[in-house]
């Protein structure tokens, strides 16, 4: 375990840090990440030595209770956080509450906005169901 300070200044222990993730990526070391939405799920995940958990920002407090030392990313749901101000507020709420990073499915500019505030942020590359109405099929969002 590594002793770190959260964005909000609380000293905690974490299984990995962003620095570890970068080093592992550079050295082609695979890591594991799963989704958890409840305290019970995160307790199970934590007991299995999964490297990282991803959860919705609304579920983060319960998930953290079940995995106090696991690196957790709080996803900012696109339909809940619409404006840049709402996205920024949601991200700050998550990291001030102890989340290790946030994920957003928004634009590169939004990712950059969060990074410029010192928030560890992941973009999202994946299926975009909302685009299937426009194009008649599911698309990969890059």
Predicted segments — roles?
Residues 131-138:
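Acidic/polar active-site rim loop that often engages polyanionic ligands
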Residues 32-35, 53-55, 72-76, 102-104, ...:
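Hydrophobic faces of well-ordered beta-strands that scaffold small-molecule active sites
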Residues 1-67:
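Conserved N-terminal beta1-alpha1 strand-loop-helix module at the mouth
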Residues 140-142:
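Conserved small/polar residues in nucleotide/adenosyl-binding loops
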Residues 59-80, 110-130:
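Alpha-helix-loop-beta-strand connector modules within alpha/beta enzyme cores
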Residues 39-42, 60, 84-87, 91, ...:
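Generic hydrophobic/aromatic pocket-lining and core-packing "Φ" positions
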Residues 70-104:
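Glycine/small-residue-rich loop that forms an oxyanion/phosphate-binding "nest" at active or ligand-binding sites
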């Amino acid at each position: 375990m590594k002793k770190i300070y959260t964005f909000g200044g609380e000293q905690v222990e974490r299984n990995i840090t962003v620095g570890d993730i970068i080093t592992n990526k550079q050295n082609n070391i695979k890591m594991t990440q799963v989704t958890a939405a409840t305290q019970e799920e995160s307790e199970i995940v934590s007991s299995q030595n999964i490297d990282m958990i991803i959860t919705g920002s609304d579920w983060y407090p319960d998930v953290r209770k079940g995995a106090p030392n696991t690196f957790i990313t709080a996803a900012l749901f696109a339909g809940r956080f619409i404006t840049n101000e709402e996205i920024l507020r949601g991200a700050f709420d998550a990291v001030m509450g102890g989340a290790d990073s946030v994920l957003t499915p928004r634009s590169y500019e939004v990712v950059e906005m969060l990074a410029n505030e010192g928030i560890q942020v992941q973009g999202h590359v994946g299926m975009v169901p909302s685009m299937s109405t426009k194009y008649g099929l599911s698309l990969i969002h890059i």
